Each structure stands twice: as structure tokens, then as C-alpha cells.
Amino acid sequence: MGTLSRLFIKFHYIMSYQGGKQRIGKEIHDVILRRALEAGYDNRPYFEPFVGLCGAMRWWADYPGKRIGNDSNQDIILLLKSLQKEWNPTAMTEEEYMTQKSSSQHSALRGYASLHSFRGMLFTGYDGGHRPGHVGRSLVKLTPLIKGVRFLPPGSYERFRSKKFIIYCDPPYKGTTSYRGQVKFDSEKFWEIMRLWSKDNLVFISESIAPDDFEIVWSRVKRCQVSTNKGKARTENLYVYRGTA
């Protein structure tokens, strides 16, 4: 295990950005890497089209191949790029939070402000006063784990066209909470794209359920952190398209 991976094992990252993989990212990484090696994908580019706050990506810090991340949340991508430039964010006050909430301009600061939202759900209400500066300190610890990651300009994952990539997708769960102001995620279209990508790439998908032509290669029960379902068990499955397992 490399130095950066050991660094993260010592780091309990507790920010609850919805859909994050902080708690089980290491297990997912291990399954994907093992299967990639078995399939002859040694050091092939690794791509996450739904990278979020790098809950899974951080575990690839020691990976020798290219690492590429993308997300539809423009503010989060700008935030990650700023962290790569050694940005050290300060404590976020409620006044600053409300200013960014009402702003229509995308920025790293707006992405940072959104992480102070209740239960990590986008600008649902300020929840950063009880531990001032905690979110910023946590992000600073993330910085060395994403050095060298190429974050693509925010945009739709549908435009991706490449071959021989290792791809990990952590899409919004079907039927779960949508962020205010965002277009509802098209799950049916997503699975069609996964079938297409799987023809020329090694593709893994995190979901609780999937179409019948996808099969489970790993599974784990976890507790939901979103307030409306907090404490309820959810089965996290890792799927591949049948014939590629």
C-alpha cells in the first residue's frame, strides 16, 4: 500500500455529500482493481463521470495510470481544481453561505458553501456553525489524494467516447432525492449508455438495483445518511454488464 493510501486510512472523512463513497470506497477500489488486472487492463486510464467529492477517486492516489474525473456539478469541479492548487478554505459563516446560495455565478467558493448544507443536500439550509472550519480542514486533507487527477470541464457524461478505460459510475440512485434546480436524472438513458460503454471498456456501476442484463460482482449493506431516510439500510451493489464479469 502506498504512502497516500496510508494517509487516507488515518483520515476519517465525515462530510456527508449526498451519494459519497467515503466509507466503502476502499472496498470498491479493491474489487475494480483486481478485476482490471485480471482483464488485462493494467495501468489503463481510470475514469469517474460522477466523481463528486472523490469518495472513490481518493483511493486511486497511488495508481500509475491516468486518473480522470467529471461531474455535472460545476461548483464541485471548480472546488476540486482549487484544492489541487493548494487552496486552503477558511470557516464558512452563515452570512457567507446565504450569499453563495443566492449567487448565480459558479465558483469554487460556491461549491465550498454548498458543503455546509444540512445533510450534504445542496443548499437546503446552513449547517456549519457547530464545528467552524471543520469542512475546510477535511478538504485540505483530501488535497494530496487528488494530485494529478485531471478534472474535465463540467458537462454531461453522455459525451464520453473512448476505449480500453476502467470506468466507475456512481450515478444518482433511481427514485431518490433530486437536488433543487437540477434536471431529474434519466436512469433509463444511463443504463443504455452503460451497455454501449461496456462494449469497449471495463465498466462498473454502483446502484441498489439494475436491469436484468447487469450482474452483481460485489455487495455491501450500508446506512443512509440523508435526513429523510437516515438510519435505514440500503444495499450497495457493484454491477457489470453481463459477459464482461
Residue ranges and their predicted role:
Residues 63-153, 157-159:
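Class I S-adenosyl-L-methionine-dependent methyltransferase module
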Residues 16, 149-150, 180-184:
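Acceptor-substrate binding/catalytic loop of class I
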Residues 59-63, 143-144, 159-163, 209-218:
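Short loop/helix-cap segments at secondary-structure boundaries that form the rim of catalytic
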Residues 28, 46-60, 69-73, 116-118, ...:
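Conserved proline-anchored active-site loop of SAM-dependent methyltransferases
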